[in-house]
Regions:
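Acidic/histidine-rich helix-loop elements
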Residues: 1-3, 59-62, 91-99, 125-133
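Active-site flanking residues adjacent to catalytic metal/cofactor-binding acidic residues
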Residues: 18, 122, 158-160
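Short, Asp-centered acidic motifs that coordinate Mg2+ and/or phosphate
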Residues: 14, 117, 154-156
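Metal-dependent phosphoesterases centered on the DNase I-like endonuclease/exonuclease/phosphatase
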Residues: 129, 133-186
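N-terminal, active-site-proximal structural segment of metallo-dependent hydrolase catalytic domains
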Residues: 1-68
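Beta-strand-turn-beta hairpins that frame and shape the catalytic cleft
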Residues: 67-81, 98-123
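Active-site environment of divalent metal-dependent phosphoester hydrolases
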Residues: 22-25, 53-55, 92, 126-129, ...
Length: 186
């Protein structure tokens, strides 16, 4: 209900969701993808699974339990294609078992000038001490965006960056401590 009321009566061309559940304990097994699709019924829908586990015993004080989630792109026009791409992640034990299988989705829309609008819905790693995986993920995304621009395509990337972007850490006064896993993009 909250998400569908956020548009304030406007009709956005694109809506990008991350951490949207299909059947997870954290959302009481409500299929949030189906809910979003029904609330934005005239929109085309593209879903990519990001995380699936029968039971995640983390954090130890309050288990995540069953998790089935992903990213969802809704658009008011049909895409010519939608492709899930995997980000590089930390494969070490136990990180591999507690971090999401990070991904991004590329949807392509033809334009009147013969090029494409390339829309990227991204969900990057968060808990990456030292920022190694996030640096690799950002490099991959930058490469793909640059390649698309070189073809003359228009590129929009949005999503959950799990980064502090260009001075945003000090943009709004706060007494909150910045966790050590936060990486600042410059």
């Amino acid at each position: 209900n909250t998400v569908s009321s956020l548009n304030g009566g406007t009709a956005p061309d694109f809506i990008l969701f991350q951490e949207i559940d299909t059947s997870s304990d954290r959302s009481w097994h409500v299929n949030q993808v189906s809910e979003a699709e029904s609330r934005f019924g005239s929109y085309a829908s593209y879903f990519a699974q990001n995380f699936h586990t029968a039971f995640l015993a983390y954090p130890l004080t309050e288990f995540h339990g069953t998790s089935n989630s992903g990213i969802l792109t809704l658009s008011n026009v049909l895409a010519s294609s939608a492709t899930r791409r995997t980000y590089p992640i930390d494969e070490s034990f136990p990180t591999k078992f507690f971090d999401l299988d990070r991904c991004f989705m590329i949807t392509r829309y033809p334009t009147s000038d013969g090029h494409e609008l390339v829309l990227i819905n991204s969900h990057m790693s968060a808990y990456d001490k030292g920022g190694t995986s996030r640096a690799q993920q950002l490099a991959l995304l930058t490469k793909i965006m640059s390649e698309e621009r070189a073809k003359g395509n228009y590129v929009i990337a949005g999503g959950d960056w799990n980064h502090a972007i260009l001075g945003s850490l000090t943009l709004y006064p706060s007494v909150q401590q910045v966790p050590d896993w936060v990486a600042e993009l410059k």
